[in-house]
Amino acid sequence: MEAARRQYRQKETTWAPPLQRDPGPWSRLVINWMATLAVIMAFGLVMLYSASYTTGYLRMGDSLHYIKQQILCMAIGIGCMAAMSYVDHRFLRWACKPCYWIVLLMLAATLAFPPLNGCRRWIRLGGLTLQTSEVAKFEMILLTAHLASSAPQIGRFRPSLKEKVRLKDWLFIRIVRQIILPVLPLVPVLVLLIMEPHMSGILLTTAIVGTILMLTGCGGVLTWCGAAAAALLLKPALTLVESIGYLQDRLNTWSDDLEALNDQTKQSLYAIGSGGLKGLGLGNSVEKQLWLPESTNDFIFSVVCEELGFIGAVLIIVLFILLIAQGLMIAYKAENQFCTMVGIGIMAQIAWQVFCNIAVVTNTIPNTGISLP
């Protein structure tokens, strides 16, 4: 019995990526992904300038204020991406464990700062501001990937009730090693985000972790059942948020009645509707002239729809879909399961942010404060 058990474990716990070849740093697939990213970044700069030059001039005295900020952030992001490409994945696996405790301390420290609009989400040091939930998202991607990839993989094995030893192993691996242990570190993070409160951060972080587990087969059908149960519990969860004032205000403004909508959502729908098929033309938006709040960040997609119309909106959505699809292909070609899960997690964050932002702008879901990547 013990010999058969060892043979089963040796045979069934080896990870084999769905696509067997590592794409390498300069493969055609990686170059195509970087080209798509460059197109999205260039498109974003053009649209940000169009949406922000009036606001920048009137509020900051510089029509290029927001463009300068964005270019600086892009340069920092590209530098970090280039630096991370030289970091060995074994170092990331080691570093994600102590970094988890640092992230918890950062989230707790956020609660000590004065609230802004009823929420404590930022650490302010001098002129610098850091939203700790963004750091927490990346840390949870690394830690979830580490814990889930450390669990044994059981391949296509399906236990029989007569094989009690193998059934016990199957349940332990599927439930404890592949679901509970990877998800357990998420609980303290969610508790601290609730205390801020930061519900959009909770939704995104949970969705990212769930996507990693589902797309890599962790937990098998049990993970999909858990996701279905979470979807069924969504409405009771929305009922519970009535105790949180600002969340209830956002839910109250989410309505099919145009007169009941808040000014931000109403102006967003006006911008989308006035764009039509081809739009008013680049730079010709009316709503960006201080009519549409947050036209330079959360609601910039409305300006895209107004100036470039339905065609422009579809174009940017297709570009994001292409970026995510190429990223997933790179992830599935990674040399080990940890790298695959990290790649899936990063693409999941982009995908969920795009979905939530466009859904908010079109009044499909309540306002979450999630920006377009």
Which role does the model predict for each range below?
Residues E2-I40, V46-P197, I358-P373:
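Membrane-helix boundary/helix-loop-helix interface segments in multi-pass membrane proteins
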Residues L72-G77, E307-G327:
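Hydrophobic alpha-helical transmembrane segments
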Residues G79, V87, L143, E242, ...:
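Transmembrane alpha-helix boundary/anchor motif
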Residues K97-P98, L104, I179-T239:
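Hydrophobic alpha-helical segments of polytopic membrane proteins
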Residues L116, R120-W122, W224-I316, E335-C339:
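Hydrophobic, glycine- and aromatic-enriched re-entrant/interface helices and adjoining loop segments
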Residues E134, W170-R174, Q178, T205, ...:
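Alpha-helical transmembrane segments of multi-pass membrane proteins, especially transporters
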Residues M195, L203, G279, V314-V318, ...:
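Hydrophobic alpha-helical segments of membrane proteins
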Residues A331-G369:
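Loop-to-helix entry and N-terminal half of a specific, functionally important transmembrane alpha helix
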